[in-house]
Amino acid sequence: MDHMSHNMDSMASMTSTMTMAMSASSTASAPMSTGSAHSMGGMDMGGKDSMHSCKISMLWNWYTIDSCFLSSQWHNTSRGMFAGSCIGVICLVICLEFLRRVGREYDAFIVRRARLRNQYLSTTASSQGLTRATDADASAEDSPNSTRGVVRAASKGAGRTLCSAFEDKTPVRPTLIEQLVRALLHMLQFAVAYFVMLLAMYFNGYIIICIFIGAFLGSFIFSWEPLNLQKEYVIPLPLPYLPQMICKELGLTCVLV
């Protein structure tokens, strides 16, 4: 009897031990299942993120959707966004041609203003000298031939001075403010051209074609300016020998002396 009771006690203890082990294993398996579920969910999310990552290649490509330029914020997630990017690239290159035209026009403005200032000052001084020479010529009508020749020489000298004022081709040095404006325009041109170069380095065929289109349109619009192919001549001849009408027909600049 004692032996049977001892066996029954041992069996009961074994049963309780197995029950505790099973409960512990079930308790440990619960966090593991939760962790595996979380890990699987993380893998799904990572797969979704990888599907919409930027496509960048250093070789020639035709990427449209998921293409990125200059920054991860410039991420084309649809064809409409990529079309807008292409239009923006075209406008950027057109803006570059516009800045170049503005730079040329500003340089021409500086030259015109400086030469007009010099012509005004020289013409004023020459007109005064020519007036004095004309008055002396009128008073020397009854004087000897030697005096008359001296007066005519002085009149011709004043006329040549007037002509030199109109044919002044000396280089013009900009002022400090004008040079600051020129440097600012050059900086803007350099910055826009640098961004265009960075866009071309993505080797996207559509973007490169848009750069070419923008260069064509910009040159067509902002390089459409008069071409000074004919040289302008200043001819210091008296009015009776070369009327002003003939000068205009020949495209020449004639100055009355």
Curated annotation (Swiss-Prot):
One of its GO terms (cellular component) is plasma membrane. It comes from the Eukaryota. Signal peptide: none annotated. The keyword Lyase does not apply. One of its GO terms (molecular function) is copper ion transmembrane transporter activity. The keyword DNA repair does not apply. Disruption phenotype: Exhibits a reduced copper content and leads to cell decolorization due to lower laccase activity, when ctrA2 is also deleted. Belongs to the copper transporter (Ctr) (TC 1.A.56) family. SLC31A subfamily. This is High-affinity copper transporter ctrC. It comes from Aspergillus fumigatus (strain ATCC MYA-4609 / CBS 101355 / FGSC A1100 / Af293).
